[in-house]
Amino acid sequence: MTDLKASSLRALKLMDLTTLNDDDTDEKVIALCHQAKTPVGNTAAICIYPRFIPIARKTLKEQGTPEIRIATVTNFPHGNDDIEIALAETRAAIAYGADEVDVVFPYRALMAGDEQVGFDLVKACKEACAAANVLLKVIIETGELKDEALIRKASEISIKAGADFIKTSTGKVAVNATPESARIMMEVIRDMGVEKTVGFKPAGGVRTAEDAQKYLAIADELFGADWADARHYRFGASSLLASLLKALGHGDGKSASSY
């Protein structure tokens, strides 16, 4: 197996196959569930808006892949600093049956100098998730933070407040995941000594098998080749799947989505 094939197979099994569009429908989510079951294995999860969780759960079960996890988003995509609303949305997502919640960190508040509200928001959402055995990923929106010190600080605050994963981006701003921001965030995980318990998720802009290979190489360099499993690493993407399948000899690499 070539290096690209090997990394593509790894990446496919680490995907949170995503649709977070304003025009999402039951039909589109059902199609996403079907795509998550591929000829070479399943994606780790799908990521959808909360209202679609019941139909996704039913579809995944009916197609014989109940183990594919369902992730959803809260405080999304704006990252406002209203803890009460973020917590209510997170509780609602859990009630819908989410296995994982990707909450947006109040990054604008941090940029304005407020470190406390981010900690408190993540901590409140973590407590709700932990009580229901739901994984919490925290989106810090690196493309808006821009500054390395801010990216580092948002990562540290999220981890201290209990994040199970730190995630680069919503996919809804001009700049999403970059290898540079990925390295900074994974270095924080390493420097805080939390690589056993905290994972990393680049999202938005990871579109090709070659892109995925680059991101996995950074993880391998920092943590060794065995670290990036589904408990420690995810790719938030949709168009990536077609490219990975093409690299693995399935399909033409064309995708209907840009995430």
Swiss-Prot record:
The keyword Lyase is assigned to this record: yes
The entry's keywords: Cytoplasm, Lyase, Schiff base
SMART domains listed in its UniProt record: DeoC (SM01133)
GO BP, sorted A to Z: 2-deoxyribose 1-phosphate catabolic process; carbohydrate catabolic process; deoxyribonucleotide catabolic process
Active site (record annotation): 102 (proton donor/acceptor), 167 (schiff-base intermediate with acetaldehyde), 201 (proton donor/acceptor)
Keyword Isomerase part of the UniProt annotation: no
Localization per Swiss-Prot or TrEMBL: Cytoplasm
Family: Belongs to the DeoC/FbaB aldolase family. DeoC type 2 subfamily.
The protein's name: Deoxyribose-phosphate aldolase
Pathway: Carbohydrate degradation; 2-deoxy-D-ribose 1-phosphate degradation; D-glyceraldehyde 3-phosphate and acetaldehyde from 2-deoxy-alpha-D-ribose 1-phosphate: step 2/2
HAMAP family membership: DeoC_type2 (MF_00592)
Function: Catalyzes a reversible aldol reaction between acetaldehyde and D-glyceraldehyde 3-phosphate to generate 2-deoxy-D-ribose 5-phosphate.
Gene Ontology CC annotations of this record: cytoplasm
GO molecular function terms attached to this record: deoxyribose-phosphate aldolase activity
